[in-house]
Amino acid sequence: SLLYGSDAMGGVIDITPAIVPLTNQFFGEAALLGKSVNGTVGGSVMLGFRKNAWFTKMRYSEQHFGDYHVPADTVIYLTQKMPLYGRKLKNTAGLERNISFFTQYHHKDYKSDYAISNVFQKNGFFPGAHGIPDISRLQDDGDSRNIELPFSQVNHLKFTTHQQYAWESILLSGDFGYQNNHREEWSAFHTHYGTQPLPEKDPDKELAFMLHTFSSSVKLRLFGSSSWEHTAGWDSQYQQNSISGYSFL
């Protein structure tokens, strides 16, 4: 925790930047993905280049999937038997869409990294195990890839930068970042309390959570000899969150 901050008291996974090619070059990669359990179709494309002091890499990935197939024709939810028409979990289709960009500048003793990424996911919930049981909502609608109520969607946006300067026996570095986590769950209004009124705004928004995180870390490392290394650092974090939805108490 002295080296990585208080959140590392239980351990840390140190994810290092991508390895920079030794020579100037342009490179790329493409991958396709398919799954039979839910008809997943997806792909990913990566492009990058090294030009003198600059190294840049970007990636875009997306996948779509349909309702999950299961080896059962019924499930029990709150003591009620719920049928699975066609042995499929209705409304469990979804999609994922991710994009990332990374660039690095390295000249002599100075190095700086900049990264931005956005991850989006939308998934349907099986209506037979969400909210008040209702067999009528389980009827096959003929479309295994549509997303209806109830569903969840999550978006995670992140900006980070790493700055570093080295002298003969001193290394000064800093990490600064911002994260935005936004999660929502939508479901037709339902309640176990007869006195709870229908919300005037977004009546079907069951849960919502928004988290803003600003973080910074500065570290000074002194290499006095081959046997000793001294480190001094400063770490700070600021968070702000908000919640909404009729299921939040």
Predicted regions and their residues:
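Flexible, solvent-exposed coil segments and beta strand-coil junctions
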Residues: V20-G28, T74-L84, D134-S144, V154, ...
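Structural signature of outer-membrane beta-barrel domains
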Residues: S1, A18, K35-V37, Q63-D67, ...
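Transmembrane beta-strands of outer-membrane beta-barrel proteins
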Residues: F26-A30, T56-M58, S112-Y114, I170-F176, ...
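Transmembrane beta-barrel wall of Gram-negative outer-membrane proteins
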Residues: N38-H64, Y77-F126, N155, T161, ...
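Signature of Gram-negative outer-membrane beta-barrel scaffolds
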Residues: R221-F223, S227-L249
